[in-house]
């Protein structure tokens, strides 16, 4: 609907591996090609290989549109330091994005 907000609920499975400790990642959520929230320094563990699920919630109040246009949400992850490897959905684990429209 016009002027609706969208609650974005993300459960992201991720693993981070490196040859050192103190792994960290950056994550952003995008609406179509526009980043709507971004962080560059999520500490993910103190071992050389770490994995698990991260949860992020975001109320997108600047969706725009007239209610008839499709909107795509997605996540992007990156390593903080060179030499780290970031993998999503490791070992067939599942990630999800749940969207809830909140009327104007």
Question: Which residues make up each language-model segment?
Answer:
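Terminal beta-strand-rich extracellular "head" domains
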Residues: 1-104
